[in-house]
Amino acid sequence: MAEVSKKRCEHNSDSQCEGCKANDKACEARDKTKETAGSAKDKTKETAGSAKDKTKETAESAKDKTKETAGSAKDKTKETAESAKDKTKETAGSAKDKTKETAESAKDKTKETAGNVRDNVENKDKNEVYENIKEGGSKAWNKTKEVANSMKDGIKDLANKDEQKK
């Protein structure tokens, strides 16, 4: 810069005039400003690039975390469904066994009643025996129907509870 100023300066001496010195200082300040602005521009680009990369990284991390959470929820739902299914099977099996026991009990009771009626046949006339048989059979049949309906309602309740859990 000094040489440029000297070339413009028309002094014969090596020392510059005040105008040339001021001009050189202005040029230096301008160059320094350009340099500082360029440095700031580069720093801004670098910071923006870093922020962009960080944002991208954070988004990828959030995406992976979301996938992981969704997978975990899916697995948990599957486990719960399997558990409910197993519980329903177990309850249905229990109800089936209970129904079978009740039916066998009703069958035994019917046999017992029939045996008692048969024992009384010898002592009573035929019409009375017929009425006793009819009454005993009717009671046993009604009891069997009542137990079957009760079991049927119980199984329906279990199925409804299973559906509600899902």
Curated annotation (Swiss-Prot):
Species: Encephalitozoon cuniculi (strain GB-M1) (Microsporidian parasite)
Recorded protein name is Uncharacterized protein ECU03_1610
The answer, when asked if Transmembrane helix is one of the entry's keywords, is no
Q: According to the UniProt record, where is the region Disordered?
A: 1-144
Give the compositionally biased regions (Basic and acidic residues). 1-13, 21-112, 119-137
Q: Where are the sequence repeats?
A: 31-41, 42-52, 53-63, 64-74, 75-85, 86-96, 97-107, 108-118
What keywords is this UniProt entry annotated with?
Repeat
Q: Origin, by domain of life?
A: Eukaryota
